[in-house]
Amino acid sequence: MTLALEALACQNMIKFPREGSEMITKREFYINGSWVAPLAPRDCPVIDPSTEDTCAVISLGSEADTDAAVAAAKAAFPAWAATSPAERRKVVEGILEQYYLRKEEMAHAISLEMGAPIDMSRDDQAECLPWHLKNFLKAFDHIEWIRPLGPHAPDTRIALEPIGVVGLITPWNWPMNQVTLKVIPALLAGCTCVLKPSEESPLSSMLFAEFCHDAGIPAGVFNLVNGDGAGVGSRLSSH
């Protein structure tokens, strides 16, 4: 990566904890391996429930933004599906490594968007990510991707294959619990995905997108579009 690209990446990163009352502004969506501006920006405040103050501003996506993310996921699917299970495991495990490097940031992000005490966010909510990811990796290691149909058909095999692009919509509460339970098994299975987190608690999901990027998840394999049900959720569900 060139110095110019490194500088741009740093500018796009969300910083936690905030300095005083510093406002977080993150209008971009993570599509095809990059943070891209919405096609039709529509600001949405993120409220800290503990103070009822606006702590961040994001943009609500449109049908066109959703279509762009789905197109990126469709284009990335053949190569990701053809990646060996061992290689997929290695790449996805990198998300866990990124979490440990930045887990305090994740705790502050969740505390801010949820209004949760920082100790609860740090010890319970943020820890959903490594807990679930580790258990998915353990289960993954016991999957037989190609196995015999049975004694009655010794020459016939069952092959497990990824199904395609997965649309994922998560609620506001316990955000990393919901995101990890949906995204990680999809990636391990060889599916590509588009995530729409709740517009009420999107900060931790955007930080999760940074983890995916820095872990080396290939462009288009994981995509994130913020938005409401009418603009993004319905469109994502229609694909």
Name each region found by the language model.
Residues 35, 80, 172-174:
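Signature tryptophan residues that serve as conserved aromatic anchors
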Residues 3-57, 90, 94, 143-169:
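Terminal low-complexity tails and localization/encapsulation signals of metabolic enzymes
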Residues 109-119, 147-153:
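Short linear capping/connector segments at secondary-structure termini
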Residues 71, 93-104, 118-143:
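Long amphipathic alpha-helix in the N-terminal Rossmann-like dinucleotide-binding domain
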Residues 47-114:
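N-terminal alpha-helical segment of soluble enzymes
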Residues 64, 101, 105, 116, ...:
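Short alpha-helical
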Residues 145-239:
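Rossmann-like NAD(P) dinucleotide-binding subdomain of oxidoreductase/dehydrogenase enzymes
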